[in-house]
Amino acid sequence: MKSFFKPLILKKFLWTLLFVFIYVLGSKLTLPFVDVSSIAKLNGDSVTLNYAAALMGGNLRSMSFFSIGLAPWMSSILIWQMFTVSKRLGFNKLSMESQEKRRMLLTLAIALIQSLALVLNLPLKTVVGVGQGTIVFLNTLILIAGTYFLIWLTDLNSSMGLGGSIMIVMVSMISYIPQDIWLSIQELKISPLILALIGFFSLCFLYLAVLVERAKYRIPINKINIHNRFKKYSYLDIRVNAAGGLPIMYAMTLVSIPQYFLMLFLFFQPNNRLLKEGILSLAMGGIPWFILYLLTIFILAWAFAFINVNSDQIAERMQRSGEYIENLYPGEATRRYIHKIVGYFAFVGALYLVLVAGLPMLLIFLDIRYMRLGMIPGMFMIFIGMVFSIKDEVDTLTLNDRYRSLF
């Protein structure tokens, strides 16, 4: 806690407060020519989109400047990482500037689809002298501009503040999701005893989630020509859940993308029954949505584990620095061994996330009103990962302050 009161950390924290204030202010600016009184209907029909937007710094409840949030940007980063992991595609050989341009173009494409799908399904006001096409174009442009403004804001926060894009997402989650959970508790008329039990099990799960988040598997590492009688090994740490809570957050967003496409097609074919059924089946509470959600979490957890712990890079780095694992040749043998260990923990972590995020969501098949309560474990996983990420950043920034000068 002392680290937080260091001048550098306080300065960064104040900058972050300013950026958060700008974000909150922008989220209150409603889109022009939108019938705000009729937005509630869209929110009721698009619960999946509401939660997906909230997990990416967006807000579909008020249809504001930042309604689609960072979803296009974060989705493009994920897709790009999937491509760059494979050396065969050659994307990792591109210059950083070329990679950034391609990511931004991908962000623009995703933002255009999401913005257009939302605007075309918004209840728009009739304004004399202003055509519907002009209103659609203007609001689509505003939403895309809002996304790029948020990207710029998170870049500023990364360089001047704390947490980068994490802070925007955390503020979005804190602003809306606890309120939704409390409304569900009131709507379901849950008794104080059941509420106390939910609170107790939530605390138990929070403790378990923190343990799993920080749990690591250590591989002893030797270094050529270094002999230390006090410490025989250094270690390569591999987290048990290497993906963290990111797969749950990204899964909600990726599962919502098909809905945006269907909403876009529905505007051009409003009487198409298949499109309407597709939107309903992909909404929260449907079996197709549930299966797709869990499958996406499993795949993302597996993928993130190999992205976060790249066996190729680790093996190459160890070979260059003269490090080796006992009874293994440097190079290919080391790479295969690390890849095997990462694969094992990737499966364990993916299974853990599916159980944590999936089992509580079974409540929605009893009553859709349990949906918000069923999402509590998943929200805990996401939030814990964000908190520890900020803590690690603060620890890194104050690392030099832990050593005292000799003179």
Curated annotation (Swiss-Prot):
Which keywords label this protein?
Cell membrane, Membrane, Protein transport, Translocation, Transmembrane, Transmembrane helix, Transport
Cell compartments where the protein resides: Cell membrane
Membrane topology according to the record: Multi-pass membrane protein
Query: Which segments cross the bilayer?
Result: 13-33, 65-85, 104-124, 133-153, 158-178, 192-212, 248-268, 287-307, 345-365, 370-390
InterPro entries per the UniProt record, alphabetical: SecY/SEC61-alpha, SecY2, SecY_dom_sf
What role is this protein assigned? Part of the accessory SecA2/SecY2 system specifically required for export of possible cell wall proteins. The central subunit of a protein translocation channel.
What does the similarity note say? Belongs to the SecY/SEC61-alpha family. SecY2 subfamily.
Fetch the HAMAP family from UniProt: SecY2 (MF_01466)
Quaternary structure? Component of the accessory SecA2/SecY2 protein translocase complex required to export cell wall proteins. May form heterotrimers with SecE and SecG subunits.
Indicate what this protein is called per its UniProt record: Accessory Sec system protein translocase subunit SecY2
| Originating species | Streptococcus gordonii (strain Challis / ATCC 35105 / BCRC 15272 / CH1 / DL1 / V288)
Q: State the taxonomy lineage.
A: Bacteria, Bacillati, Bacillota, Bacilli, Lactobacillales
Q: Which gene encodes it?
A: secY2
